[in-house]
UniProtKB/Swiss-Prot annotation:
It catalyses: 2 D-alanine + ATP = D-alanyl-D-alanine + ADP + phosphate + H(+). The lineage of its organism: Bacteria, Bacillati, Actinomycetota, Actinomycetes, Mycobacteriales. Pathway: Cell wall biogenesis; peptidoglycan biosynthesis. Cell wall formation. GO terms for cellular component: cytosol. Its cofactor is Mg(2+); Mn(2+). It is found in: Cytoplasm. This is D-alanine--D-alanine ligase.
Length: 361
C-alpha cells in the first residue's frame, strides 16, 4: 500500500497474534479500524497469524467481525517485516525488501501473551516509534497476575487471597485451608477467561490445574470473592490528566457453563448485560474510580487500562488490570467511556495523540 496522504497520521493497527486471544484481537481491531477518524488518520493494517507470521492486514473491518458465533482469524497473505532500525522507524517491508508502508505510531491491538505482555512494546521501543498504551514494564507486570497482585499489595491496595503454583507444585493442606472453597484456577499470564476453572471440590483441583497449565506453566489459585463484578476504565490524556470512567456492573456472569464469566459467556452466548453507571452508592463509585487510577499509577501505566473489581460487603477488592482491554463492539472499555461522555472515535483520538505526545517529550 502507499502512504498517499502524508498530512494524516499513519496508524499501524496490529492484531491477531500467537495467544489464545487471537480472535478477540481481530474483532477489536476491526472496530478500531472502523472508528479511527479517516479525516485525521490513515490506517495501516498489520495481521499476525496464529503461528507468528506478520502479513498484510485486512483493511475491511467487516471481515474482522464475529458472525454467527464464528470468530475471525488472520489469514496467510503476503508477509511483511517491521523495521527495528531507528533510521527506518515505522517501516514495514515485503520479503523482497520493497516498502509496504511507513507508520507514525503503532496501535498494538494484541490481547494476551506475545502482545499485551511487553514483548511487542519492547520490540518497537528498539526502533523508537510511538506505541499506544502502556510500555514494557507496565504491560509485563499487568499481564502476570502474580506480579500484578504483588505490586498492588505493596501499594496497600485491596486484593484477595491467592497461591502461586510453579514447577508442577500442588496445593498443600495449609494452603487449601487458607483459600477455602470454592477457588478459581487460572493461568498466571492469560486473559479472556481462557483456561480458567471454578473448583468447588478439592478432588476436581488437579484437572483444573492441568487445564490452566495448557496455557501457562505458572498457575494462580484464588479464593472466591463474593460480590458483583465491576469494571472501570482509565484514560490518560496527552496533557497527562488521568481520568476514570463511570464503572460498569456486570449481570449474568454466573450463567456461563462453568458458573463464572468464561470465554463463551463474554463473547458468544449473549447472556451478560452491563449497567453503566453501576448501581452503587456514590461513595463506592468514587472509591472504585480512585482505586482504578491508583492501580494504573502503581503499575506506571500510560494511555489506557481497564481495572476489574469485586464489590464486597466490606468494599471493593481488586481482581486484575488489563493494559490493552478489548475494543470489540460489546467490550466494556469503550462502552464505559461512551457513558462517561467520550465516544469511540474521540477515545481512539486521545489514545493515539497521547502516544505521539509521550514520544515527543
Amino acid at each position: 500500500m502507499s502512504n498517499s496522504n502524508s498530512a494524516k497520521v499513519r496508524v499501524a493497527v496490529l492484531y491477531g497474534g500467537r495467544s489464545a486471544e487471537h480472535s478477540v484481537s481481530c474483532v477489536s481491531a476491526g472496530a478500531i479500524i472502523a472508528h479511527l477518524d479517516p479525516e485525521k488518520y490513515e490506517v495501516i493494517p498489520v495481521g499476525i497469524t496464529t503461528d507468528g507470521a506478520w502479513v498484510v492486514g485486512e483493511s475491511d473491518p467487516e471481515r474482522l467481525r464475529l458472525v454467527d458465533r464464528t470468530m475471525p482469524e488472520v489469514q496467510r497473505r503476503e508477509e511483511i517485516r517491521p523495521s527495528l532500525d531507528p533510521a527506518h522507524r515505522g517501516e514495514f517491508h515485503f520479503a523482497d525488501g520493497s516498502l509496504y508502508a511507513t507508520a507514525d505510531v503503532i496501535f498494538p491491538v494484541l490481547h494476551g501473551r506475545f502482545g499485551e505482555d511487553g514483548t511487542i512494546q519492547g520490540m518497537f521501543a528498539l526502533s523508537d516509534i510511538p506505541v499506544v498504551g502502556p510500555g514494557v514494564l507496565s504491560s509485563a507486570a499487568g499481564m502476570d497476575k502474580e506480579f500484578t497482585k504483588k505490586l498492588m499489595a505493596a501499594e496497600g491496595l485491596p486484593i484477595g487471597r491467592e497461591v502461586i503454583l510453579r514447577d508442577r507444585a500442588e496445593l498443600t493442606d495449609a494452603e487449601k485451608k487458607l483459600l477455602g472453597l470454592p477457588v478459581f484456577v487460572k493461568p498466571a499470564r492469560g486473559g479472556s477467561s481462557i483456561g480458567i476453572s471454578k473448583v468447588s471440590r478439592w478432588e476436581d483441583l488437579p484437572a483444573a490445574v492441568d487445564l490452566a497449565r495448557q496455557h501457562d506453566e505458572k498457575v494462580i489459585v484464588e479464593s472466591e470473592i463474593v460480590g458483583p463484578e465491576v469494571e472501570c476504565g482509565v484514560l490518560q490524556y496527552p496533557d497527562g490528566r488521568i481520568v476514570a470512567s463511570l464503572p460498569a456492573m456486570l449481570r449474568g456472569t454466573e450463567d456461563g457453563e462453568g458458573g463464572f464469566y468464561d470465554f463463551d459467556t463474554k463473547y458468544l452466548d449473549n447472556v451478560v448485560t452491563a449497567e453503566i453507571p453501576a448501581p452503587l452508592d456514590e461513595e463506592i463509585i468514587e472509591l472504585v474510580q480512585s482505586l482504578a487510577v491508583e492501580t494504573f499509577q502503581a503499575l506506571a501505566c500510560e494511555g489506557l487500562a481497564r481495572v476489574d473489581f469485586f464489590v464486597t460487603a466490606n468494599g471493593p477488592v481488586l481482581n486484575e488490570i488489563n493494559t490493552m482491554p478489548g475494543f470489540t463492539p460489546i467490550s466494556m472499555y469503550p462502552q464505559m467511556f461512551a457513558a462517561s461522555g467520550v465516544g469511540y472515535e474521540e477515545l481512539l483520538d486521545v489514545l493515539v495523540q497521547q502516544a505521539l505526545h509521550r514520544s515527543s517529550n
